[in-house]
Each structure stands twice: as C-alpha cells, then as structure tokens.
Amino acid sequence: MTTVNTDLIIYDDLAQTAFLERRQDNLAIFNASSNGAILLDNELIEGDFRKRAFYKVGGSIESRDVNSTEKVTGKKIGAGEAVSVKAPWKYGPYETTEEAFKRRGRSVDEFSEVIGTDVADATLEGYVKYGLKALAAAIGANADMVVTADIETDGKKTLTRGLRKYGDKFNRVVLFVMHSATYFDIVDEAIANKIYEEAGVVVYGGQPGTLGKPVLVTDTMDADAILGLVAGAVTVTESQAPGFRSYDINDQENLAIGYRAEGVVNVDLLGYSWDTSKGDNPDLTKIGTAGNWKKHFTSNKSTAGVLIKLGSAAGE
C-alpha cells in the first residue's frame, strides 16, 4: 500500500498555522499599544522600493489691498517623492533529531509548533527594531529635530525639550520610545521630586515623568536616546508573503527535521525617504545609517518625530 499525505505529519502547515495565530494576536496588540505611532501592516509591494509622488504647496493667506489695481504674480506648486525601501530577513534554520522529542515522550510535530510561535515573536521584535533604527537615523540626521538633555539635571524637562520642537503642534507627539534603563531613570527622578508628602502619602503630578503620554519601553532602543513620535511615524509593511520551509534531514546518523523562514518588509517613515543612491536590500546597519535617509517634507512639524539625545547613559 502506498503512503499518501494523510498518513504523514506535514510540518509546513502546522508551523505556519502557529505563526499566523501568534502574529494575529501580536499585530492587534502592538498597533493599539503604540498609540498609532508605529504601525505594522502587510501588503503586497512590487520592486525594491515603493515610490509615491505628492504635491508640495505650503501656502498661506496674505493681506489684500481692496483699493489696489496692481497685477499679482502666480505662484508655483511643487512636487516631492516619498520612498520606502525593502529589507529582506531570514530566520533559522533550526534543526532537531526526532529522537530528541521521542525520548521526552513528545510528538515530533511539537517542534513545528514551537518554532512557528517563536518566528512570529522574532519577526515582531525584528520589525520594531527596523522601524526604530530607521527613525533614529533619519530624525538624527535632521538637526532641527534633535535636542540634548540630561535626566538627572533636567528631570521632566527632558521630554518637554523634545516637545518644544513641535511648538503649538506639541500634541501631535503621541508616544515616547525609550530603553528600559532610561524609563526607570525618568520614573526614579519623578519619585525623588514628589510634589507633596504627608504621613507617608505621596501625591505625584500626572503619570510619573512621562507627561501623561504613553511610553513604549524596549531594549532594542539605544539607552542614550529617546524618540518622541507622532501618529504614523513609521509603517513597517510585510511586503511579500513570508516563506516557511520544514524539511527532512536524512543524511545524518539520526533522522532529523529542520525549519527555516524568510521574508521582506518595507520601512516607510513619515516625512523621510530612503536615498535610492545608497542601494537596495539594506541590512539593519544600513537601515540605521543617518546618511541613507533624507527629509522630503518641508515642515519639520509634519515629520515623524523628535530625537532626544541624553547627556549621560541611562542607569548611570
């Protein structure tokens, strides 16, 4: 009798199912918790870059002389181009002998479930890292949107220094992103500078240290910097269907199976474009290189956010 598919465990489907279930949960939670500043999406995008043209007007009203018969000169509108870049990634390969699971009284298909869940978590963390590296690089290259501060001496002014860059539009900043050590330094400072204490009861002004704004705490962020981001600051799009591959390993002493995955994301920043002269298919280092991004919006208040450089490393 011939063996058919129903006689076997097909790991690709099981691993991908675990991946999709975990990814669905991760995306829903993350997009909401980032307050819309960091968006994770999926959409089929062709080519190495996504290029979109837009109009640049930036007009304003002027005084009009009701008694004048002078001619007026027409003004031109301009055009700009927004460019996002594709960044390829890989996961694994991971391999295990079937014996390693059988000796534990476990089904070998558990390997695919474990790996499928892990790749979903790994890609989420990786996508966030791509986005934050790109933001820090692009904003860091725009001197008008960079400030310096020291948490120990500036306290809450560390964050308001960044908000000042937006002037009357400061409420556009919807999220602060910082390393965990930086976050605890800010909270420690807020506790040390309490507003009122009586018989052990302490009253603090608003949320300690963060001006009532949510904070994304991630150790993928540099410890000596804080990002203040507006809504839609970065969109990381899974721009090709990710590939998953489970495979048999039959040329070793023990029967084994392996698993690997690969995919591509587009990194799209608000107000900044990838410089296509810097090449395509960048790795994380190139994504995080300031000279590889350029501002295409005229107004800084319309761009992704502000970068606060800390005078001393967090935790010191």
Which role does the model predict for each range below?
Residues 1-85, 237, 242, 297-316:
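N-terminal "assembly arms/tails" that initiate or stabilize quaternary assembly
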Residues 200-256:
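Extended serine/threonine-enriched, polar tracts that run as long, contiguous segments within proteins
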Residues 65, 187-189, 226-229, 268-279:
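Short conserved micro-motifs at the rims of enzyme active sites and ligand-binding pockets
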Residues 98-169, 282-315:
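Alpha-helical scaffold segments that mediate packing/assembly in large oligomeric complexes
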Residues 137-214:
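Extended, solvent-exposed, turn-rich assembly/linker loops in the middle of proteins
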Residues 2-3, 7, 238-316:
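Extended, compositionally biased alpha-helical segments that mediate assembly or anchoring
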Residues 77-106:
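Short acidic, glycine/tyrosine-flanked loop/strand segments centered on an H-E-D-like triad
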Residues 14-19, 48-49, 53, 107-127, ...:
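Hydrophobic face of amphipathic alpha-helices
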